């Protein structure tokens, strides 16, 4: 980082402070993770300089022979990782991956059906504030009021009533296994396409610990970060029969030049996800989440759906009289990073919420296992049960710092920062 250190002190300091925050905080936001240094090196490479509109070997610019190699590798690795017939790795994000599928098969005003945002869905699955709910007629399915599991009977009834052209599977705050086969059965019964947004579960699917939607869905979209532990970006998988439509929808449909440095980083992440070590990582992510949920239940808290099959744990705080925002802020002071989150049938608005969402991907990347999850659950419980007690918050903060030092993050980067700090001290 010496070039940045010498060129832009303000940005350098912001990056160093963000590194220190990541190092000394328990990162429990379910959609966040820590990429490998190899992924970051690829993303920070000379490929950032190259424009490459079009597809590999069919570019609108010259000089693309080496970025073609990177994109070819990313495509083939994505296909192999998820057993897919076709992959487009150019979407800049999960949102743009979803948009590309919509644009490929829908017309404005067509009906789509996705999971209700307040029940665990995502903005791009038809929320009224999002393009998906503005351009298309969105209908929402949800979870059962008692079990908090997807209500497939309701989903079927709504599909029969509204005849959607596309049904969206997947979620951003649903901790359980989703029955992809059931979704396809319902989609077929009304002549709808099935698109699965596996963004949250992609790494678990790659690791073999969560069901793969590819055999069932017409289209599968995803991000490449979260459980997949790659750069912040997206991709699309589909059957060969839809390949041309998807490729044209991405470019020139919704994007111009792809980000070749990010595509190179995706290729690295896909290769990492093919390893036996990654399979063990995915298994540990789920094991950690299950222990976290179990400990919260022992501490007297209500866990939505009674547990988890994934990396997500959703706490319902209504019995505590606290809002998600209050708990998020209190935990933040104790160096524990979570996000406030709606729970099913939440009476509070999104800026407050009645719950918090936690996830285990980032802490598992740092090497933490079941014993650490038990400690983390107890520390979080201590803060919630003593909300507003600054002595308790400081005690927990010190415990967190000590734990984080036992599982260092990017030690090579830390050495470089310390070296540059010594140089700065001599100025």
Swiss-Prot record:
SUPFAM superfamilies linked to this entry: PLP-dependent transferases
Major subcellular site: cytoplasm
Catalyzed reaction equations: (6R)-5,10-methylene-5,6,7,8-tetrahydrofolate + glycine + H2O = (6S)-5,6,7,8-tetrahydrofolate + L-serine; L-threonine = acetaldehyde + glycine; L-allo-threonine = acetaldehyde + glycine
Nuclease among keywords: no
One GO cellular component term: cytosol
Cofactor(s) the protein needs: pyridoxal 5'-phosphate
Pathway: One-carbon metabolism; tetrahydrofolate interconversion; Amino-acid biosynthesis; glycine biosynthesis; glycine from L-serine: step 1/1
EC number: 2.1.2.1, 4.1.2.48
GO biological process, one term: glycine biosynthetic process from serine
List of residues binding (6S)-5,6,7,8-tetrahydrofolate: 117, 121-123
Subcellular location: Cytoplasm
Activity profile over pH: Optimum pH is 7.4 for the THF-independent L-allothreonine aldolase activity. More than 95% of full activity remains at pH 8.4, although the activities are reduced to about 90% at pH 6.9 and about 75% at pH 5.9.
Molecular function via GO: glycine hydroxymethyltransferase activity; L-allo-threonine aldolase activity; pyridoxal phosphate binding
One of the Pfam families matching this protein, by short name: SHMT
NCBIfam families assigned to the protein according to its UniProt record, in alphabetical order: PRK00011.1
Protein name: Serine hydroxymethyltransferase
Gene coding for it: glyA
